[in-house]
């Protein structure tokens, strides 16, 4: 669950810290979290 903290909270600092991991692994996300990973973590966490 800790992996997806950035998904839940709109904290930009957390997003920046964890961005690279999520960008690399975004295709291997858990099914329930896939939407979050794709939309929020692609293209430099654009949604934040």
From Swiss-Prot:
Signal peptide: none annotated. Disulfide bonds: none annotated. It comes from the Eukaryota. Testis. One of its GO terms (molecular function) is DNA binding. Belongs to the protamine P1 family. The lineage of its organism: Eukaryota, Metazoa, Chordata, Craniata, Vertebrata. Keywords: Chromosome, Developmental protein, Differentiation, Disulfide bond, DNA condensation, DNA-binding, Nucleosome core, Nucleus, Spermatogenesis. This is Sperm protamine P1. GO terms for biological process: chromosome condensation; sperm DNA condensation. It comes from Cavia porcellus (Guinea pig). GO terms for cellular component: nucleosome; nucleus. The keyword Nucleus applies. It is found in: Nucleus; Chromosome. Protamines substitute for histones in the chromatin of sperm during the haploid phase of spermatogenesis. They compact sperm DNA into a highly condensed, stable and inactive complex. Cross-linked by interchain disulfide bonds around the DNA-helix. PROSITE patterns: PROTAMINE_P1.
């Amino acid at each position: 669950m800790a992996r997806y903290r950035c998904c839940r909270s709109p904290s930009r600092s957390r997003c920046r810290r964890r961005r690279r991991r999520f960008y690399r692994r975004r295709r291997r996300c858990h099914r329930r979290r896939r939407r979050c990973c794709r939309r929020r973590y692609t293209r430099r966490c654009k949604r934040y």
